[in-house]
Amino acid sequence: WAQGLKSIINAKAPNTELDWKDRISGEQPTISHEIGQWCVYPDLKERKKYTGVLKAKNFDIFEDRLRENGLLHLADSFLLASGKLQTLCYKADIEAALRTKGFGGFQLLDLHDFPGQGSALVGVLNPFWESKGYVTPQEYSEFCNRVVPLARMPRLVYNSGDTLKVSVEVAQYGAENLTLPVDWKLITSDGRLIKGGRFEQCNLPTGTLSHVGNLEIPLLVDKPQQCSLEVSTGGYRNHWNIWVYPTVKVENGDVMVASEWNEEVRTRLEEGGKVLLTARFGTLKNE
């Protein structure tokens, strides 16, 4: 998170291929320490739970700032939205560790918020080990468990006519080796099955990452669709959302769309035309 917009999650388009194999391939040891620390918005309702000497005075400051900006009525919405994003970020971080063969493990700062040093709202639980209401134990256990199905996809946004290419893996850290079928299915947001199948009797030795097989699924839609790829084995399940859009040719009409200032743009404006200029940072002089 300290990298801000330059971090892997922010700098690259959404995908599920991230791992740390290049990072651990060198001669120096790599330590995974307090990964993530993805913060959420404070739950102002939590203050009434502090009945002892410790008081959540920092939450009073957060409430004052919301009120001053006319946003107090959105406090619960901010908590829910930031919590859903936090869950996706922890899922990305934890799955990256599990996708790294030979990786020794990962460590979070905590599963619950840490109130002992300023505001560290990094947990999926509050300081009282209670749910914040945006993720269930079942949902979190999909990607953080002794057995975790995994799917490597180069991107999560597609056009109709594209092929969804997936490498299916299983991270298995249970007590013993397993030999199990691995099922998969791609469904729409309303539960309609697009395609499904099974990899029969896969060897899943304990303490490692196992490659199960590859998928190639044609994507054909006539309207935007959010779909879910689900992979399951032995009672363990994981899923990832993808988005598929129809290929539509966009007509600009009488509006010129340009990404840089040039003579053609200047001429169009001098003639009274319309221009949508989406200039990249640093391409215009600071005059």
Language-model segments: residues:
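Substrate-binding/catalytic cleft of secreted carbohydrate-active enzymes
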Residues: 1-125
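Outer-membrane beta-barrel proteins
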Residues: 82, 154-156, 172, 203, ...
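Aromatic-rich peripheral "rim/lid" segments of glycoside hydrolase catalytic domains that contact
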Residues: 109-173, 182
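Beta-strand-rich binding/interaction modules
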Residues: 161-201, 210-218, 224-233
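Low-complexity, Pro/Ser/Thr- and charge-rich linker/hinge segments at domain boundaries
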Residues: 243-261
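A glycine-rich, often tryptophan-bearing local segment used as a flexible ligand/cofactor-contacting loop or short
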Residues: 261-287
